[in-house]
Amino acid sequence: MGSKAKKRVLLPTRPAPPTVEQILEDVRGAPAEDPVFTILAPEDPPVPFRMMEDAEAPGEQLYQQSRAYVAANQRLQQAGNVLRQRCELLQRAGEDLEREVAQMKQAALPAAEAASSG
């Protein structure tokens, strides 16, 4: 048998990652309806920063920030619960799949033995 030399494929070099300034420029230049802003938009959005700057009382700012924090925290807890439930579903599905594969192997084993001895 002859030995085969593996040919290495040269891949192009990766571009340098964007700088913080480039990322900020990109985000600032994106329209408000850009998916990056709308795909995970909260149901109860926090008060925009410019409205907070216009607020008369700093206490109101703190109150609005606190409300936004509590709402975000609740959404994170709900997302965590959903992830736990989905993880459990996937684990059960994996166990079911393993059980079914084992059953299929058991069913196929006698047929294979019969074919080889016959």
From Swiss-Prot:
Q: Which InterPro entries match?
A: UPF0449
- Residues annotated as carrying Phosphotyrosine in the record are 63
Instruction: Note the coiled coil stretches, chain numbering.
Output: 81-109
Top-level taxon of the source organism:
Eukaryota
Keywords on this record? Coiled coil, Phosphoprotein
What Pfam family is a match for this entry?
A: UPF0449
Q: Give the family per the record.
A: Belongs to the UPF0449 family.
Name used for this protein in its record: UPF0449 protein C19orf25
What species is given as this protein's source?
A: Homo sapiens (Human)
